[in-house]
From Swiss-Prot:
The keyword Cell inner membrane does not apply. InterPro entries: Ribosomal_bL9 (IPR000244), Ribosomal_bL9/RNase_H1_N (IPR009027), Ribosomal_bL9_bac/chp (IPR020594), Ribosomal_bL9_C (IPR020069), Ribosomal_bL9_C_sf (IPR036791), Ribosomal_bL9_N (IPR020070), Ribosomal_bL9_N_sf (IPR036935). One of its GO terms (cellular component) is ribosome. It comes from the Bacteria. It comes from Legionella pneumophila subsp. pneumophila (strain Philadelphia 1 / ATCC 33152 / DSM 7513). It holds the Pfam family Ribosomal_L9_N. Belongs to the bacterial ribosomal protein bL9 family. This is Large ribosomal subunit protein bL9.
Length: 149
């Protein structure tokens, strides 16, 4: 299935690219999420007319993402968790706990944006967690885990 991308999609292409994708990916994800349209001649003509508008919208989204990333880079969150004397947590600190700590600081974020490739954190200490606020912008969030009293 051929589609025209209406925005940048990670590991697929940029705005305006005509790409070949599997039918299920196109019909069930890209098109319903307004990330792409079918690559018909009529849609190609409509896209060319709307290209400037879509590029402006993409630039605004990138600028907003860079502002959010700057705010996140300057932020350190402190999470208190029950831990043993050796510093091992009685559980773990994952995406939900980090998201909740950011919401307490009035920073809106979705769980999908927080990336923890090694999985949840299991011990006390300072960590750097990646936050993908945009496909081109990655922020580094400082997370400090302290033992609960």
């Amino acid at each position: 299935m051929e589609v025209i991308l209406l925005e940048k999609v990670r590991n697929l292409g940029n705005l305006g690219d005509k790409v070949h994708v599997k039918s299920g990916y196109g019909r069930n994800y890209l098109i319903p999420q307004n990330k792409a349209v079918f690559a018909t001649e009529q849609n190609i003509e409509l896209f060319e007319k709307r290209r400037a508008e879509l590029e402006k919208k993409a630039q605004q989204a990138l600028a907003n993402a860079e502002q959010r990333a700057a705010k996140l880079n300057d932020t350190t969150i402190v999470i208190s968790a029950m831990a043993s004397d050796e510093g091992k947590l009685y559980g773990s600190v994952g995406v939900n706990e980090i998201k909740d700590a950011l919401i307490e600081k009035q920073i809106e974020i979705s769980k999908r944006e927080i990336v923890m490739p090694e999985g949840p954190l299991h011990s006390i200490g300072n960590y750097v967690v990646e936050v993908h606020v945009h496909s081109d912008v990655v922020a580094n969030l400082q997370v400090e885990i302290i033992p609960a009293k």
